[in-house]
Amino acid sequence: MSASRPQFSIDDAFELSLEDTGPGLEPSGVARFGPLHFERRARFEVADEDKQSRLRYQNLENDEDGAQASPEPDGGVSSRDSGQTSIRSSQWSFSSISSSTQRSYNACCSWTQHPLIQKNHRVVLASFLLLLLGLVLILTGVGLEVAPSPGVSSAIFFVPGFLLLVPGVYHVIFIYCAVKGHRGFQFFYLPYFEK
């Protein structure tokens, strides 16, 4: 049986069918894919392009009067206004302060702007409510352990507190990680989320 059929090799997986006739046909009539080549860019090229684009956008922010701006080595921007040269380093620093403040706000609260979070805001609020109620009940139980009251057991607060805290923490952390795109966390796995 093996003599009548040719052996399969890994090269056979890259052959095109006979219907696919293209410019890459071999003398045997079988088209083959060429070798794969990946183009790598040096890190310094990417960093240089990123730096230039950042400077370009910062210069656009700082240049209200339409003057041509170019980066200075000391971090300022010199602009040429009919032969006069002025350094706008103070405006540059204010611009960077406001953009860094904006970035920190966006990093903190950007996950609330996700479309699935806004669509399922009730589920997200319920998750936070479970978390907070669980914490309040557990802290009440701890308070009763520290200063016992006759006739009231702290277990009455500990048990429901943990029952509310565990799913609350789970959902809040899961939602946050899914928004941030961490591996293994997807909204698909939360059954209460409408996709």
Swiss-Prot record:
Compartments, record wording: Membrane; Cytoplasm, Perinuclear region
Keywords: Cytoplasm, Membrane, Phosphoprotein, Transmembrane, Transmembrane helix
Mode of membrane association: Multi-pass membrane protein
InterPro entries (UniProt xref): TMEM134, TMEM_230/134
Sequence positions bearing Phosphoserine: 93
Ranges per topology, Extracellular: 144-154
Region of interest (Disordered), residue spans: 60-91
Any one cellular-component term (Gene Ontology): membrane
Spans within the Cytoplasmic topological domain: 1-122, 176-195
TM stretches of this protein: 123-143, 155-175
Homology family: Belongs to the TMEM134/TMEM230 family.
Name of the protein described by the UniProt record: Transmembrane protein 134
Gene for this chain: TMEM134
